[in-house]
Amino acid sequence: MRVKVTLACTECKQRNYNTTKNKKNNPDRIELQKYCRFCKKHTTHKETK
């Protein structure tokens, strides 16, 4: 089952991206390298509630 998740920048805490994930394959919180337009660089984005 795919669920909607929000990704937040670890440096400025802005919630920049919405995506979906498969809870069966990824039961833990995901971390991705994404571009943050507020920091103006690529940073780690973590899944938030």
Swiss-Prot record:
Keyword terms, alphabetized:
Ribonucleoprotein, Ribosomal protein
**Family stated for the protein in its record:** Belongs to the bacterial ribosomal protein bL33 family.
Identification of the protein by name: Large ribosomal subunit protein bL33
Q: Which terms in the GO cellular component ontology are assigned?
A: cytoplasm; ribonucleoprotein complex; ribosome
The record, for InterPro entries, names:
Ribosomal_bL33 (IPR001705), Ribosomal_bL33_CS (IPR018264), Ribosomal_bL33_sf (IPR038584), Ribosomal_zn-bd (IPR011332)
Q: Name one GO molecular function term.
A: structural constituent of ribosome
Lineage of the organism: Bacteria, Bacillati, Bacillota, Clostridia, Peptostreptococcales
Q: Which PANTHER family match?
A: 50S RIBOSOMAL PROTEIN L33, CHLOROPLASTIC, LARGE RIBOSOMAL SUBUNIT PROTEIN BL33C
Specify the domain of life of the species encoding this protein: Bacteria
Biological process terms from the Gene Ontology for this record are:
translation
Q: In the UniProt record, does the keyword Electron transport occur?
A: no
